[in-house]
């Protein structure tokens, strides 16, 4: 296999495209059937399907790491090491006492940053560790990239939360003004790294707001 290069531009493009793909792959199953499941009788089968689509959303950081690694033509070991670091730093897992809880999709901005850092750390460690990379590379990438991702997680949570608050405030104005604001906001979101699908699902958009968001996305 040809050694992947460390150039910045192709790496950034792979991170952006890979994370965009991961958002779609992880969130679309829930987006398609979550409302339908609420309308159905709450049987054991329906509950199981709800669990399945909820867990699928929590795999977003893993999908992102593997897609980015594939786009950068990284080895299986490098890609798997990236996935470890990205999953740990994503915010999907929270610790409460002795329990580990998996919920949500994680913080997409921190996922993107961690995949960017991990892609470089993985490639550099492969070159430096040589024959020992199978033993030490997962640990090195996890500690360095995952550690940096955890340090930046609170900042990224604040940034993403602020954007969500701005969008939520737009739902409290008159329908005409809300339509204009939602069109503008989602036109911005669709060309930004922020997950427009996730924000729309979190707000439960419907009616004028949903139509305006779709119009803004199409216009962008």
Range-by-range predicted roles:
Residues 1-220:
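Pore-lining transmembrane helices
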